[in-house]
Amino acid sequence: MSSQICRSASKAAKSLLSSAKNARFFSEGRAIGAAAAVSASGKIPLYASNFARSSGSGVASKSWITGLLALPAAAYMIQDQEVLAAEMERTFIAIKPDGVQRGLISEIISRFERKGFKLVGIKVIVPSKDFAQKHYHDLKERPFFNGLCDFLSSGPVIAMVWEGDGVIRYGRKLIGATDPQKSEPGTIRGDLAVTVGRNIIHGSDGPETAKDEISLWFKPQELVSYTSNSEKWLYGDN
């Protein structure tokens, strides 16, 4: 939603600024727009109100109008720095040994790709029992902990890092419920798995978990930052 707002705001700002012929209007609006952008990030009080109070009533009215019209410019200025930065995120996804042995690698990857998410890290690894225990450390008090770790370390795992707008939250929706019997049709587990003990895939359940799991499974140099050709069609304002 915020991306759509910023794209609409940026279009309005470009149209407004390209048609502005009054130099004073342009400079005042630009200043107020810049201040509004900073105010939106909570750094300083809104400049427009101070500007209005320090001017005469006629000028004050004009300044408020100028500031109002400059708000799209403010949104345009902050969208790349804060809004998009907050939305573009990374998550850890692993295809478990059962998913690998059943030949579901391409099927699972294609579902993330078709959604528009970007693969920035991938490798095949057979994790040790100790490594599996680190991965499932938050479940160490559960009765099924040892069995879970034994299974994860029983064969090759496809470890991946995916990037995209809302990839953590939507990735979990795409995967489905932990129990495949409770997963909706159309989800990976709902379509491809049968039992909890063999639910073929793991996905980070939140930003902090994603950060921890990515750092556990990958070294920084194993992740690649790049711009795909599809991004302008997914996120662009064209």
UniProtKB/Swiss-Prot annotation:
Record-listed E.C. numbers: 2.7.4.6
SMART domains cross-referenced by the UniProt entry: NDK
Active site: H202 (pros-phosphohistidine intermediate)
Annotated organelle transit peptide span: 1-85
Cofactor(s) essential for the protein: Mg(2+)
Domain of life where this protein originates: Eukaryota
InterPro entries, sorted: NDK-like_dom, NDK-like_dom_sf, Nucleoside_diP_kinase, Nucleoside_diP_kinase_AS
Cleaved signal peptide residues: none
GO terms classed as biological process: CTP biosynthetic process; GTP biosynthetic process; UTP biosynthetic process
Reactions accelerated catalytically: a 2'-deoxyribonucleoside 5'-diphosphate + ATP = a 2'-deoxyribonucleoside 5'-triphosphate + ADP; a ribonucleoside 5'-diphosphate + ATP = a ribonucleoside 5'-triphosphate + ADP
Localization: Plastid, Chloroplast thylakoid lumen; Mitochondrion intermembrane space
Any one GO molecular-function label of the UniProt entry: ATP binding
Pfam families cross-referenced by the UniProt entry: NDK
Main localization of the protein described in the UniProt heading: plastid
Keywords assigned by UniProt, alphabetized: ATP-binding, Chloroplast, Kinase, Magnesium, Metal-binding, Mitochondrion, Nucleotide metabolism, Nucleotide-binding, Plastid, Thylakoid, Transferase, Transit peptide
Residues reported to bind ATP: K96, F144, R172, T178, R189, N199
Uppermost EC category: transferase
PANTHER family recorded: NUCLEOSIDE DIPHOSPHATE KINASE
Role, per record: Major role in the synthesis of nucleoside triphosphates other than ATP. The ATP gamma phosphate is transferred to the NDP beta phosphate via a ping-pong mechanism, using a phosphorylated active-site intermediate. Shows the highest specificity towards GDP.
HAMAP family recorded: NDP_kinase (MF_00451)
NCBIfam families attached to this UniProt entry: PRK00668.1
Subunit structure of this chain's protein: Homohexamer.
Family designation: Belongs to the NDK family.
Protein name, entry field: Nucleoside diphosphate kinase III, chloroplastic/mitochondrial
Species this protein is from: Arabidopsis thaliana (Mouse-ear cress)
